[in-house]
Amino acid sequence: MNYILQTNSLTKKYKNFQALNGLTMNVPKGSIYGFVGKNGAGKTTLIRLICGLQEPTSGSFSLYGIRNDSKDIIKSRRRMGAVVETPSIYMDMTAEENLKHQYLILGLPSFDCIQELLKLVGLDNTGEKKAKNFSLGMKQRLGIAIALAGDPDFLVLDEPVNGLDPQGIVEMRELILKLNREKQITVLISSHILDELSRLA
């Protein structure tokens, strides 16, 4: 079995609070992997650790077979996209402008793929509409588009359906399945909603 992410007794403590306690898990390549737990169970902490936003207290993980204490982990992280907690969106920009900004940050040489990416997430008809005027579901989909800007093959989504109305949940579910089936992107989803995860993972 080929694994994108493997964790081994991964632990994170903050003074007297243990956010993550000895987590061992394996995310197979090509899967939609659901990571379920109540609020405060350490789901976001795990995502912050694998994204390099924090360091584990003990234990380890590997991404594409590269351990987190290797200097090459940076290269592995370039192959992943993530939406951690709330999407990183500039509210006074359009969807297209947000993506152009992300392309510049990543040093991508051309904007040629932006329209295709907007179409993929269902935001190709938003025109000059600013992100601040988007619905919550549209903002979530824009966040995913931004995470996809570097053409990753591993996507990490932190509570992607949290706060969405029923239609927004359906649209998010369809998008995640589409990314997995058509683009062969491995997806790790954290959620406290078991029913919704069971329809995906």
Label each region the model flagged.
Residues 51:
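Helix-to-loop junction immediately C-terminal to a conserved catalytic motif
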Residues 59-69, 75-76:
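Conserved ABC transporter NBD signature motif
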Residues 100, 104, 109-126:
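Conserved ABC ATPase "signature" region
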Residues 155-159:
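Catalytic Walker B motif of ABC-type/P-loop ATPase nucleotide-binding domains
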Residues 170-183:
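Helical segment within the ABC ATPase nucleotide-binding domain
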